[in-house]
Regions:
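Well-ordered beta-strand positions
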Residues: 84-85, 130, 182, 206-209, ...
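Conserved hydrophobic positions within beta-strands
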Residues: 83, 166, 204-207, 241
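Short polar/acidic secondary-structure junctions
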Residues: 52, 169, 210-212, 268
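Short coil-to-beta-strand transition motifs
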Residues: 73-78, 194-203, 257-258
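Pseudouridine synthases involved in rRNA/tRNA modification
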Residues: 1-34, 81, 196, 212-215, ...
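Short Pro/Gly-enriched beta-strand edge/turn motifs at strand-loop
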Residues: 186-189, 200-202, 243-248
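Structural detector for hydrophobic anchor residues on beta-strands
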Residues: 162, 177, 201-203, 216-218
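RNA pseudouridine synthases
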Residues: 1-176, 180, 185, 286-287
Length: 291
């Protein structure tokens, strides 16, 4: 498989090595394959590792499929996929609430299976959403791009924003929660704030709107990606999410009022800025009824 793109005007001159490692964030294993097999071409010519590249140069990366075996997967239902964006390398979809991102067993059908059927090839999960959470989620369309997208996520180069309808009036316009999160010893399904043994977690919260019925609409930005992070942080600070079956079981909302509203990142190969927003019909209906 070949990927071809033009070095944008915004990039300064740099060596091939620096470009692959620091700009494209290509992991070491893939860089090794590209270098030893001479599978990076600049203006259709082989290059050495310390050669300088500049804006306007055409870059071509060649990936041998035998180096990246495709994982077999059971096809799902393509009609259940709501596409937001798709190109040669990746696809972004709007996940409905009540659907798992991926199954726990090979035969279990989840969003990953539906997306693979929709695309017509095996896709790969880059990040996940809780079953009860709706919203934007990113999948890799081939095993070459997956580790590159994973590295973007690890380096916090992928920005994720959520909307949540919470109990109470959020007093401050901006809040930052840095409480450590760990497992609940009494309920394996849940997580709790655990200052001693938990993992560091950081959530930035912005109040968007307050309602007369003592609820608030907030925007949450993740700086880390712990399980149930937003749900635990908001609940711990007295603002449980409406409809949360684990952390607010007495709420009358018909669904968890947490939605992954926005996804933004620089495309790792085209270097174009990508930013997408999407709402959910059920989220909007519940917001109108409970807000």
């Amino acid at each position: 498989m070949k990927f071809t793109f033009v070095i944008p005007d915004s990039l300064p001159e740099m060596t091939v090595k620096v470009f692959l490692e620091e700009q494209l964030l290509i992991p070491r294993k893939i860089r090794h394959f590209l270098r030893t097999k001479k599978h990076i071409l600049i203006n259709q010519e082989e290059v050495h590792w310390h050669q300088t590249i500049k804006s306007g140069d055409e870059c071509q990366l060649i990936f041998d499929e035998e180096d990246y075996p495709t994982k077999e997967i059971v096809w799902g239902n393509p009609n259940l996929v709501q596409e937001v964006y798709q190109d040669q390398h990746l696809i972004i979809v709007n996940k409905p609430e009540g659907m798992k991102t991926h199954g726990n067993q090979p035969e279990e059908i989840a969003l990953l299976n539906h997306v693979s059927a929709y695309v017509g090839q095996t896709c790969y999960v880059v990040h996940r959403l809780d079953k009860e959470t709706s919203g934007l989620i990113l999948f890799a369309k081939n095993p070459f791009i997956l580790p590159i997208l994973n590295r973007l996520l690890e380096k916090k180069e992928i920005s994720r924003e959520y909307w949540a309808l919470v109990e109470g009036k959020v007093g401050s316009k901006e809040l930052i929660f840095r409480d450590k999160i760990g497992r609940d010893r009494h309920d394996r399904r849940k997580r709790v704030v655990d200052f001693k043994n938990g993992q560091y977690a950081e959530t930035h919260v912005t109040r968007l709107k307050q309602f007369q019925n003592k609820t608030s609409l907030v925007r949450c930005r993740l700086k880390t990606g712990r399980t149930h992070q937003i749900r635990v942080h908001l609940s711990h600070h007295g603002h449980s999410i409406l409809g949360d079956p684990l952390y607010n079981p007495h709420s009358k909302a018909k669904r968890l009022m947490l939605h992954a509203f926005k996804l933004s990142f620089i495309h790792p190969l085209t270097l174009n800025q990508l930013s997408f927003t999407a709402l959910s019909g059920t989220f909007e209906r519940e917001l109108n009824q409970n807000g």
